[in-house]
Amino acid sequence: RRQRQMCIRDSLIPLFTVASESGDRDIPAEVAQLTDSLKKQFAPDRRVALLDIDYSFSDKNVMLRGVTTSAEAKNVLLKELARKGYTVMDCLELLPDVKGLEGKTCGIINVSVANMRVAPDFSSEMMTQSLMGMPVRVLQRDGWVRIQTPDNYIAWVHRVGVHPVTEEEMVAWNKAEKIVVTAHYGFVYSEPNQTSQTVSDVVAGNRLKWEGSKGAFYKVTYPDGRRGYISKSIAMPEKKWRSGLQQDAAGIIRTAHTMMGIPYLWAGTSSKGVDCSGFMRTILFMHDIIIPRDASQQAYVGEHIDIAADFSNLQPGDLIFFGRKATPERKERVVHVGMYIGGKRFIHSQGDVHISSFDPADELFDEYNLGRLLFATRVLPYINKEEGLNTTETNEYYK
């Protein structure tokens, strides 16, 4: 507690020269090199791991501020700074902030679609979205809540969007029988009829606690305890849904076709709107499959496939990637993804969800994307066999 008070007090008194770890000239070269090394080792992708450090120097005295999700990275940093002769005041916060969260280091998404942002502000760029009933890790609370989703993505969500719970409460939620929303869009009502007051909207993939049935409706409970009724025509019990689930390419492609015309939305991962990788993630999640969030992450799971000139080595359900091809001066860069559906055609979200073709003779020919085609990956055979490819039955967040 004394250390925390000193960190707060000293943050108000400019005794040190403040330097950011992002290359500020006031950081000694040996410290900058150490920081770069630790980031490469412990947080190479800040979408899923954090090591954000601000340094304040006064000769060989240094104050550390910022946050990290890696206890090991913090321990190595402190040890190496001491070895280099620095006297360290440690105000680097290890997430989750267990004390600040009062033990509620878990959470459940409490709105149909929760917008997740770079910073805790409505004007901040949206990074991704999460769906009602989804279990998350709560890392930090500052008016807004910093969470980590089952695909390990880290971002800020408004406090209304997530219901904080303890680990024990999370386990209870995960074990409870649930209703899964199967329609792209719908509502929960305050009474078992569609003329009553709405409680909220819902989208495909939302999960609510199942409390029983009344006529043509399921009685459900929200993560925060609200109650309502949802039509049996747009939802079903999770166990029944899972027993009839098809996780093959044909079934997933049929689901993809049901989203035709849905508008492109940057960072979108719901049937309200999707970006390219969000579309892949959404249609797979409708089949209980969890994959990494972004195209640049999805590109490196499953089996890599160098696409044949006639596309003969592709199979329906393969993910196909587009972007900047490698040159002697620049690395390859993935910026877009779609799903191969056969016959040299693919379905993707670009403007809206639609089908395009690699065949110049096809009326759906897409010359632009053919020109930036990179490679494909085959992910379906590797579900639950490779890190980053799993289901809600095996993902640690759902246990």
Q: Where do the PLM segments sit?
A:
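Beta-loop motif signature
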Residues: 109-132, 181-210, 264
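Active-site nucleophilic cysteine motif
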Residues: 256, 268-287
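N-terminal targeting leaders
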Residues: 9-129, 134, 159-165, 237
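...with weaker cross-activation on analogous glycine-rich loops/strands in unrelated enzymes
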Residues: 291-355, 361
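Short, small-residue-biased leader/transition segments that mark boundaries at the very start
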Residues: 1-8
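Aromatic- and glycine-rich peptidoglycan recognition patches
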Residues: 164-167, 186, 193-196, 236-238, ...
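Boundary regions of SH3-family modules and the immediately adjacent low-complexity/disordered segments
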Residues: 75, 79-101, 121, 149-183, ...
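A generic structural signal for residues embedded in beta-strands
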Residues: 138, 210, 321-322
